[in-house]
UniProtKB/Swiss-Prot annotation:
Broad EC category: translocase
GO cellular component: cell envelope Sec protein transport complex; cytosol; plasma membrane
Family matches, as SMART domains: SecA_DEAD, SecA_PP_bind
This protein's name: Protein translocase subunit SecA 2
Keywords: ATP-binding, Cell membrane, Cytoplasm, Membrane, Nucleotide-binding, Protein transport, Translocase, Translocation, Transport
Length: 764
């Protein structure tokens, strides 16, 4: 992608586009603010409504001035010029790059009000429930000052509460809750049962995380229907297998392969002739693969924890429990069996939606993050979004030390502990970012053994994160945390109340240490950005070993020679450059996976739009009755003679919607199955993506007619009376229970291709 950037830069797609003009508008807003200061509240609101309807420079300047006055009067907050500049760029549809601690929450609220004053419905999208509730409450007075309404949607709300919340002018909500509500609304058979009423604008906090890192994560709506899981006996047998003797794991530990000796042992114990016979290849072998992958690749306290007797997945990019997430391919059940837990029931996937497709439902998408510049290419490629860099209110005083590279992880760990101990003796607060729960606990134990009190923030105690982070800048504080992305609490020097601020400043501010480099430089910078908030002093430093994942994966196939000192440290610019190269390679791999997956998902997303439009017509008009009465006129005439038209329209609607929803679910299952096996088509010298698209188009054309044909057949035979269509009597029932979850990245994939009978197994 780096080679592509020069092209669009030359075409005018600069990160800092229009910033001179924006600064001039902000300067004009400051002058207008003085003139507007004497206006009454009613006049401020009326003038803001008027200015919001226009997009010329003068109106924009006036609107910024009036929004600033509103913030002062309602929140006692006086926005800096850089915050007004950020508001302006969001109102122009950009993603803003704004450093941690620069006041993005106020910026997002002011921009939301600016859009809402135009008559647009705004969804202010957060990464979790805590931030949605916090921001809606914190910024609520500003919204209400301008005569608008505000609400928060969280997991705890019931259907009626959600419906009321979505009716607000501005809605704060986690992206997952919005997506799940979209999916649930796609099952309603009466418009009044839907909770959402659409929105015009999505303002996305942590935009790179939502729009890039999690863009292709499917949100799933499932119904109760048995799925496939490994039998208990198979789990016990697989537990006996030994790595390198019965199976092998590839270098990056993403794939595991059963060898002949392992297969022979399983066949002997199970009493079967061959795992690869037709009778077993789609059943027993699938279960063996599931159990083996769960046993060999998924590690407790790295990929998941056990909480309240249930598996809780860990979001690697955030270091916290991934709420409502589960694995695909029956892996979830396999891990539950491995850990001796109750195996959860599988289900039929009724509908699915990626976050990228969800964002496509909004006419306007914009946002803010502290690491937008690093995601510029992806935001441009996948969303046609531009990045505007907002300079900090005060220049950063943070010192970014060069990486300390060690030969082995053991040597790196010893040096890391020694450095933390040294900093702690000075009283300087230290925040250490680790890659997973297991590492955070190991590091905490090593520090505690040296009589250092440690606060640990990881997926096991993420409910306490706000308090732990708020105190991380206190004098002498040592905090160990898995990932800092999406943790919205600021770290203030001297503690939450800044009582010892001067003392901490004198000691150099907050020291942030990364225990390794991540596969994306954005994640490194999210951690680094916690130090040096609003011109504070600070320090950032990363420890790296040549055994770290980013080096092993990014440097695969390359030989590197180095001479470590007695402590294992390699002080060489050549090695430091090599580590940076490895990170760029892994970033390129992630981007390629995203790009390829997007190409597969794009056609299904387009087909979904057609299904949504068809469903809306059936839901909002009498189209279903018109089509069915034309197809079966005799029955339609008889029913019309004795039943109210409203009953007939609703009965026809339910018949049509049932078969449309069912056929769409079947289509998703089929295309997932096609995608799992599409790589085999390269053997026949066919292009996998082209073949996938050919099949998807062909099957979708058949879907439309099949749904209508089935509906006509049902309409002809089903009983329709005063109580409507008796679909249940005809064996046509919707699931009695549904649930939602996110499909975590499949840990058992190679080039984004499942090596076992994938998510389609849940459908069948």
């Amino acid at each position: 992608m780096a080679g592509f950037r020069w092209f669009w830069d030359a075409m005018g797609g600069k990160n800092t586009r229009n910033q001179t003009k924006s600064k001039n508008i902000v300067a004009q807003a400051a002058k207008r603010g003085v003139q507007f200061a004497s206006l009454s509240d009613a006049d401020v609101v009326a003038r803001a409504h008027e200015c919001a309807q226009h997009s010329d420079d003068e109106s924009r300047a006036d609107l910024l001035a009036l929004l600033s006055i509103g913030a002062q009067r309602s929140l006692s907050m006086n926005p800096f010029n850089v915050q007004l500049q950020a508001v302006l760029r969001i109102l122009e549809g950009d993603v803003i790059h704004m450093a941690t601690g620069e006041g993005k929450t106020l910026v997002g609220a002011m921009a939301s009000v600016g859009y809402a004053l135009q008559g647009k419905r705004v969804h202010s999208i957060t990464v979790n429930d805590y931030l949605a509730e916090r921001d809606a409450e914190w910024m609520g007075d500003l919204v209400r000052y301008f005569g608008l309404t505000v609400s928060a949607v969280t997991e705890s709300l019931n259907t009626e509460q959600r419906r009321r919340a979505y009716a607000s002018s501005i809605v704060y909500a986690p992206v997952t809750e919005i997506g799940f509500d979209v999916l649930r609304d796609q099952l309603v058979t009466q418009r009044s049962h839907a909770v959402q009423n659409g929105a015009d604008v999505a303002i996305v906090d942590e935009a790179d995380s939502v729009l890039i890192d999690e863009a292709l994560v499917p949100l799933v709506l499932a119904g109760n229907e048995p799925g496939t899981a490994p039998a208990g006996r198979i789990t016990e047998i697989v537990r006996r297998l030994k790595e390198n003797e019965h199976y092998s794991v590839d270098a990056d530990r993403r794939n595991v392969s059963l060898n002949d000796k392992g297969a022979a042992l399983l066949e002997q114990v199970l009493g079967i002739q061959s795992l690869y016979d037709d009778a077993h290849i789609g059943t027993t072998l699938v279960q063996v693969n599931l159990a083996l992958h769960a046993q060999a690749l998924l590690i407790r306290d790295v990929h998941y924890i056990i909480r309240d007797g249930k598996i809780a997945l860990i979001d690697a990019s955030k270091g916290r429990v991934a709420q409502l997430q589960r694995w695909p391919d029956g892996v979830q059940a396999a891990v539950e069996a491995k850990e001796g837990l109750v195996v959860t029931e599988g289900g039929r996937i009724l509908d699915t939606l990626t976050l990228q497709s969800l964002m496509g439902r909004y006419p306007i998408v914009c946002g803010m993050t502290g690491t937008a510049v690093e995601a510029t290419d992806q935001l441009r490629q996948f969303y046609d979004l531009r990045v505007s860099v907002i300079e900090p209110h005060k220049q950063s005083q943070r010192f970014d030390e060069a990486d300390r590279v060690y030969a082995t992880q053991a040597e790196k760990f010893r040096a890391l502990v020694k450095e933390i101990e040294l900093l702690h003796t000075t009283g300087q607060p230290v925040l250490i970012g680790t890659s997973d729960v297991s590492e955070s606990e190991e590091l905490a134990q090593a520090l505690q053994a040296r009589d250092i009190t440690v606060n640990v923030l990881n997926a096991k105690n993420d409910a306490e994160e706000a308090q732990i982070i708020a105190e991380a800048g206190d004098i002498g504080r040592v905090t160990v945390s898995t990932q800092m992305a999406g943790r919205g609490t600021d770290i203030r020097l001297g503690g939450a109340n800044e009582k010892d601020r001067d003392a901490v400043v004198a000691k150099g501010g907050l020291a942030v240490i990364g225990s390794s480099r991540h596969r994306s430089s954005r994640l490194d910078n999210q951690l680094r950005g916690r130090a040096g908030r609003q011109g504070d002093p600070g320090l950032s430093l990363f420890f790296v070993s040549l055994e770290d994942d980013v080096v092993v994966v990014g440097g695969a196939g390359e030989e590197i020679k180095a001479l470590p000192d007695a402590d294992g440290r390699i002080d060489s610019k050549r090695i430091t450059d090599f580590v940076a190269h490895c990170q760029r390679v892994t970033e390129g791999q992630l981007l390629e996976i995203h790009s390829q997956t997007w190409k597969y998902n794009k056609l299904l997303a387009d087909q979904r739009v057609i299904i949504d439009e068809r469903r809306a017509r059936l839901l909002d008009t009498d189209q279903a009755w018109v089509e069915l009465s034309e197809a079966v006129p005799e029955k339609a005439h008889k029913l019309s003679d004795k039943l109210d038209p409203a009953i007939l329209v609703q009965a026809a609607r339910e018949v049509m919607l049932y078969h449309l929803d069912r056929c769409w679910s079947d289509h998703l299952a089929l295309m997932d199955h096609v995608r799992e096996s599409i790589h085999l088509r390269t053997i026949a010298r066919e292009t996998p993506l082209d073949e996938y698209h050919r099949i998807a188009v062909r099957e979708f054309k058949q879907l439309a007619q099949r749904a209508v044909d089935l509906a006509v057949e049902t309409f002809r035979d089903v009983t329709i009376d005063q109580d409507g269509a008796h679909l249940a009597d005809a064996g046509l029932t919707r699931p009695s229970a549904t649930w939602t979850y996110m499909v975590s990245d499949n840990p058992l994939s190679n080039n984004n291709r499942s090596v076992i009978n994938g998510i389609g197994s849940i459908f069948r």
